[in-house]
Structures are given as structure tokens and as C-alpha cells.
């Protein structure tokens, strides 16, 4: 039995991150510090998706997603979409693209890396390795899987 009833309330203005893999929504909330915002944030976990799987969803009112946030989001949820909402209507829809690099977001997992002892910001080059996302540290030059780098988020 299919229902067209919305399971997560509509927002007037802001953005919606849709098609987040189940379980990644919490990481995105932490990464974007959405638990600290004064704006209304509506979250849905394990919602049914059209393909029969489940997904997470995040709606943020009266806020715009930044390019930096979109790049970070592409690492955690590369197949997610970002919908821009104005006056309760979707005015723009963006698919995500992996950035070439990401800076000052994730710590280097290598405990011997200079980023842990010197006043430098972390910096990773993004690479696809055998169909998986890899992040190469600018300083120690070690490459890590996306899962290892984002595990502490």
C-alpha cells in the first residue's frame, strides 16, 4: 500500500539533503554542526526510498548550503541530492560531485603526520582507486579510504 503522505514536514525556505545513505545522516549533522544552529532542522532516518531501500534526509530552514559543505557532503553521501527550497517549492536541485581536494575538515588518520604536531591545516587530495574514494594526505603522502578518514566525524 503506497502513501503520498509526507513523513517529514515541508520547509518554507532553506535546503534539503535527500538520498543520504541510511546511517550517514548523523555524521552529516555533526560535520555541519547542525545540532548547534538556531534554525529549525528536521531529520528523517531510515525513511523508505523509491527503490525499496531506506535513506536519511535532512531539512535545514533559512540557511544556504556552502560550496565547502557540498564538497564535504560529496565524500559522505556521493549520491545525495541537495534541493534548494523557496516559498515551499524546490527552485533548484543539485547532484554532488567529488571535490579535487578537501582542507581543514578531517584530521589525518596517520598519528605520525605533521598535522598532529604543527600548526598546519589538514589537506587531502581526492582520488578514485579501483572504484573507491581515497584521500591522500598532502603532508605525509599516505592514502586512506574514505571510511577511515571520515570515521571520526
Swiss-Prot record:
InterPro entries, alphabetized = Asp_carbamoyltransf_reg_N, Asp_carbamoylTrfase_reg, Asp_carbamoyltrfase_reg_C, Asp_carbatrfase_reg_C_sf, Asp_carbatrfase_reg_N_sf
Q: List the cysteine pairs that form cystine.
A: none
Instruction: State a single Gene Ontology molecular function.
Output: metal ion binding
Which residues does Zn(2+) bind? 108, 113, 137, 140
Copy out the cofactor comment.
Binds 1 zinc ion per subunit.
- List required co-factors: Zn(2+)
**What Gene Ontology cellular component terms go with this record?**
aspartate carbamoyltransferase complex
What does the UniProt keyword field contain?
Answer: Metal-binding, Pyrimidine biosynthesis, Zinc
Q: What Gene Ontology terms for biological process does this UniProt record contain?
A: 'de novo' pyrimidine nucleobase biosynthetic process; pyrimidine nucleotide biosynthetic process
Does the keyword section mention Metal-binding?
Answer: yes
Q: What interactions and quaternary structure are annotated? A: Contains catalytic and regulatory chains.
Q: Which family does it belong to?
A: Belongs to the PyrI family.
Name of the protein in question? Aspartate carbamoyltransferase regulatory chain
The gene behind this protein is pyrI
Amino acid at each position: 500500500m503506497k502513501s503520498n503522505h509526507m513523513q517529514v514536514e515541508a520547509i518554507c525556505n532553506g535546503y534539503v539533503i535527500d538520498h543520504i545513505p541510511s546511517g550517514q545522516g548523523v555524521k552529516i549533522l555533526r560535520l555541519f554542526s547542525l545540532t548547534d544552529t538556531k534554525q529549525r532542522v528536521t531529520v528523517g532516518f531510515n525513511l523508505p526510498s523509491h527503490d525499496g531501500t531506506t535513506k536519511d534526509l535532512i531539512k535545514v530552514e533559512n540557511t544556504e548550503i556552502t560550496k565547502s559543505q557540498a564538497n564535504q557532503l560529496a565524500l559522505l553521501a556521493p549520491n545525495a541530492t541537495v534541493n534548494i527550497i523557496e516559498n515551499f517549492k524546490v527552485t533548484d536541485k543539485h547532484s554532488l560531485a567529488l571535490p579535487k581536494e578537501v582542507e581543514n575538515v578531517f584530521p589525518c588518520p596517520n598519528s605520525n603526520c605533521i598535522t598532529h604536531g604543527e600548526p598546519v591545516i589538514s589537506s587531502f587530495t581526492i582520488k578514485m582507486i579501483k572504484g573507491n574514494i581515497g584521500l591522500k594526505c598532502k603532508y605525509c603522502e599516505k592514502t586512506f579510504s574514505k571510511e577511515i578518514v571520515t570515521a571520526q566525524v
